[in-house]
Design a protein with these regions (language model features):
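A recognition module on extended beta-rich or small alphabeta surfaces enriched in W/G with H and D/E
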Residues: 111-127
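Sec-dependent bacterial lipoprotein signal peptides
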Residues: 1-3
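Acidic/polar, low-complexity intrinsically disordered N-terminal segments immediately downstream
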Residues: 5-94, 100, 126-130, 136-143, ...
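Conserved, compact domain cores that house catalytic/ligand-binding motifs in diverse enzymes
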Residues: 180-185
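Aromatic- and glycine-enriched pocket-lining scaffold segments that form the walls
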Residues: 176
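Conserved small/polar residues in nucleotide/adenosyl-binding loops
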Residues: 186-193
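An anionic, turn-rich surface loop/hairpin at beta-sheet edges
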Residues: 94-116
Length: 194
C-alpha cells in the first residue's frame, strides 16, 4: 500500500540561507555595541572562577581585548587579533588568531592542561542586550553584555576593583567526612589552604 501526501515547507528559506542570515545578524550585533562588550569568561566550570574581559569588534574582523588587572602585566594594555563568526554547531564566535590575553586560558602548560579554557564559543542566544555563549570544547556557559553608554572600560574596571577592595576576604573551615579543609576567599578567588 502506498500513498502520496504533500509536504509543506516548515521554513520560508533553506537552512544555508537561514544560517547566513544568522551569521550576518551576529556580526552586526557584535560590531554594533557602541562601547564594546564585557565578556564574563569562565575557563573551566568550577576550578578558577570568572574573569572580566573587555572586547570591541570591528567590521573588518578585528577584535581588541583587554582585561581586569590580575590578568594583565600592564593594566590598560590592549591586544588586537582576528575573529570570525562561522557556521559550525550553529553560529560560532571563533578567536582564530592568537590573542595573548584571551588564549592564555586555552594554552596548555607543561602538564598539557593550562586553565582548560576555550577560544571558540557556540552562540546560544544573541541580541543587542546580551549574548549567551557555550564553550565549544568545555561546554561552560558564559555571557557577554554591552558596556553601558557613557561608561569606559577604565571606569567600569575601577568600580569593579573598588568592590573587590570592599571585600577583604575570609577563611572558613569545612569538615568533609572528618577531614577539615580551610578555604581562603580573597579578591574573588577561592584557594584551598593547609
Amino acid at each position: 500500500i502506498s500513498s502520496c501526501s504533500d509536504e509543506n515547507d516548515i521554513f520560508d528559506s533553506s537552512s544555508a540561507r537561514r544560517m547566513n542570515a544568522m551569521l550576518q545578524e551576529c556580526n552586526e550585533i557584535l560590531t554594533g555595541a557602541e562601547n564594546g562588550w564585557i565578556f564574563e569568561y569562565y575557563p573551566e566550570d568550577s576550578k578558577y572562577g570568572g574573569f572580566q574581559l573587555y572586547m570591541t569588534f570591528s567590521k573588518e574582523g578585528e577584535v581588541k581585548v583587554t582585561a581586569e588587572s590580575p590578568i594583565l602585566e600592564s593594566p590598560g594594555e590592549q591586544v588586537t587579533s582576528m575573529y570570525q563568526v562561522k557556521a559550525d554547531m550553529g553560529p560560532v564566535l571563533s578567536f582564530d588568531t592568537y590573542n595573548r590575553i584571551l588564549h592564555q586560558f586555552s594554552d596548555p602548560n607543561p602538564d598539557g592542561l593550562g586553565y582548560e579554557g576555550d577560544y571558540e564559543f557556540v552562540i546560544l542566544t544573541i541580541n543587542k542586550d546580551g549574548i549567551e555563549l557555550r564553550g565549544k570544547k568545555t561546554g561552560v556557559k558564559m555571557q557577554m553584555i554591552p558596556l553601558p553608554a557613557g561608561t569606559t572600560w577604565e571606569s567600569y574596571s575601577n568600580r569593579l576593583n573598588k568592590m573587590i577592595q570592599a571585600f577583604p576576604g575570609f577563611t572558613m573551615r569545612l569538615n568533609i567526612d572528618g577531614t577539615v579543609i580551610a578555604v581562603s576567599y580573597t579578591h574573588l578567588r577561592a584557594h584551598e589552604t593547609r
